[in-house]
Amino acid sequence: MLNSKGKYCSICTLVLVCTLIAGCDNPAKNAPADDLKVVIIRHAEKPVAGDNLSCQGQNRALQLPAILAKKFIKPDYTYVPALKSDKSTAHSRMFQTVTPLAVKYDLTINSKYRQNEYADVAKSVLKKNGVVLMVWSHSEMPDLVRALGVDNAPKWADEDFDSIWLVTYANGKATLAADNQGLKPATNCSF
């Protein structure tokens, strides 16, 4: 027979066990929101040598806010890979591509994750609601979309700066659709 102290401990233990069981990984609880849209683009055009955008790439970056707003509304979040600051600034093109959009809509650019930290960046993105824009390197995109839940991710063509990938979710399942920006930016810098 339990005394009142023993009953109290038994009840506390039961409550703790029930709480732990209820808090265990529930796939529905951890599934991405059905309103999540992940828009993925490659950085804009680059010069033959160097880490920055070319004039054509800068012109594309300046035109992107209008194009993306027309197609998807403005993003709620933006992600680019972390900048490297060694002898060069690798990944600066992604930052330069998204900057006009971030300025126009007063968005924070999340650059916390390295280019190949697919699982970590996907974990962060999949917790969001709304529209997430990711500007990434084309060679990394198949791994990136696989981390976002897409099964058969195609390669992104080396010469393609115009495509848009859109990952949407329904009942926790990811679907990848392709679109394009439809831009043909000028190759000269007018500034």
What is each model feature region?
Residues 2-12:
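Bacterial N-terminal signal peptides that target proteins for export
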Residues 20-23:
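C-terminal motif of bacterial Sec signal peptides marking the signal peptidase cleavage site
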Residues 132-135:
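Periplasmic-binding protein-like
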Residues 26-129, 140-191:
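Active-site-proximal alpha-helix that buttresses catalytic centers in soluble enzyme cores
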Residues 14-18:
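Hydrophobic alpha-helical targeting segments used for export or membrane insertion
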